[in-house]
Amino acid sequence: MTWKIVSDSGCDFRELKDLALDTNFENVPLTIQVGQEIFIDNAELNIDLMMEKMYATSTASKSACPSPDDYLKAFAGADNIFVVTITGTLSGSHNSAQVAKKLYLEEHPNVNIHVIDSLSAGGEVDLLVQKLNQLISNGLSFDEIVQEITNYQSKTKLLFVLAKVDNLVKNGRLNKLIGAVVGLPNIRMVGEAGPQGTLELLQKARGYKKSLSAAFEEIIKAGYAGGEIIISHRNNDKFCQQFSDLVKEKFPNAQIQAIPTSGLCSFYAEEGGLLMGYEIG
């Protein structure tokens, strides 16, 4: 039995450490258009250059989801396939994956495919992808993994801290009124992915220190009790370190990873932004 874990650019991993036996990890990239230039969000993407060009251009930049054909290519060569996409509320990637699943099963009826709408992005997607690899490593069957990952997803959440939201507003991913408030000097948006996968405002924090304490306050309020955290961030090592210290004061055994955002997550989180996936319960 061979396995594949497939994710789009909502996932920040470009490779998975300790990949399970007989398992491959495939990334299906979204694209980002800056002016007339198209950036493909794969391992070769120079994210710093893309961001530099984005801030230098006066025209609105935008992202585009993978086609069903992109997913079909990624499916090839495995008996069991798990797909994790960025929230379907904000991107057509999930729909493309579902279309590809239908087409692929018509040609390969003996293959198992499970498509997961993360209803999220960044760190929470990373947690789901990492968990799939662990479940495959544990020797579970396809159906058992479907059950386990569904249960696990109900115990993960996304918290984000953003100093800039221009791209989210311009691309219709965030309310303009919220965008106007966050656009004020030194105001950061502390929010979450809601139950339907939309971006919801929790707090408007004035200044760095208040955003740090607000983020910690919100994960505790949501039910965090020392589980794993993955912080995907755009050039914000300082926040990651200080937030980790804050968490470990209360939960010394907490596992916390900090990883750079993908091209897509960098595009939407912008400079200094964080997309934090965490376990609750």
Curated annotation (Swiss-Prot):
Assigned keywords, A-Z: Lipid-binding
PROSITE patterns (alphabetical): DEGV
Record bears the keyword Hydrolase: no
Result of knocking out the encoding gene: No effect on export of cell wall protein GspB.
Domain DegV: 3-280
Keyword Chaperone found: no
Residues reported to bind hexadecanoate: S63, S91
Function: May bind long-chain fatty acids, such as palmitate, and may play a role in lipid transport or fatty acid metabolism.
NCBIfam families given in the database record: DegV
Name by which UniProt lists this protein: DegV domain-containing protein
Naturally occurring in which organism (per UniProt): Streptococcus gordonii
